[in-house]
Amino acid sequence: TEKFNGGYESWDSNRDKWCRSRNTFCKKYPRSQYNAAIHNIESIACYDYKAKIDSNVHRLHSVITNIQKDYRHFLLYDEQPLVGIDIANSQPYLLCLLFNPIFWEKDSNTTLNIGTLPTNIQSLFSQEHFVEIRDYVSSLTAEALQEYKQIASEGRVYDHIMSLINSRRNTTLDKKNVKTMMLIVFFSKNRYYHQQGATLKRLFDNTYPEIYSLIALAKRDNHAALACLLQSIESEIILHRCCKRIWKESNHQVPVFTIHDSIATTTEHVEWVKGIMQEELTNAIGIPPTLKEEQWNLSQVGHPQYLY
């Protein structure tokens, strides 16, 4: 591809990355990126997939999750192309589970509640905090949540909020701006609110005040708690429900590869895998998701003129 043909210097196109520990943008080093790409490609060639579930949010990491997106289009399974099945607007969609008061009760009889998640995730919240969140959610009306749940189910959260804010505020936000806004809303500290950079966070609060209040309440004692909770919910559903069921019902014959909120499989199995994902996500979250397919093949590669 263009980056490999151009050597180290061509890798500087992805030069800036947000560094949480330094609270600023840091340079990405082309040499490190180049070496990482080569390392991942060689690992796949050697069948060393480096699969490991982390002990923090219990996501599965592998050479496939680590490799840059463009290079996934070169991957085949048994000479067959792969298709990724993604949850549209996954984090905003998974948030809908937290609107259910019963989720916050460890001993409830729901298929997925805080008590079914790993103990380190449960320990992010005190029992008093569980009760406080549950009581707050119980106080919300169905009308306050209805619109958000509808657009989350349809995978239109970013588009809807972009349109809503632009019409109300006479602004020109694009989808990238809105995705940034959602990252800030979900993962930044609550005290980061009145600063100039938190404008989009305030816009979300003004648009969905009840939902913003729930997010802020969940992050009150630990701003990382919500991110860890949502990613753990994602892992529970994708790995331990969808993939486990696929593996069992197919008698170990259907290949699956996960990239956090996405499952990839071969073309012939896409519809069947999508059906299982649809059922498991709907059962767990309470509303159906929108699933999108991404073809992994050379026609999707950036700068295809460098392939041959």
Language-model region placement:
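Helical catalytic core of nucleic-acid polymerases
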Residues: 64-223
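Active-site palm subdomain of RNA-directed nucleic acid polymerases
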Residues: 236-259
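Surface-exposed, low-hydrophobicity interaction/linker segments
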Residues: 35-36, 43, 52, 199-244
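C-terminal polymerase-core module
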Residues: 189-200, 270-308
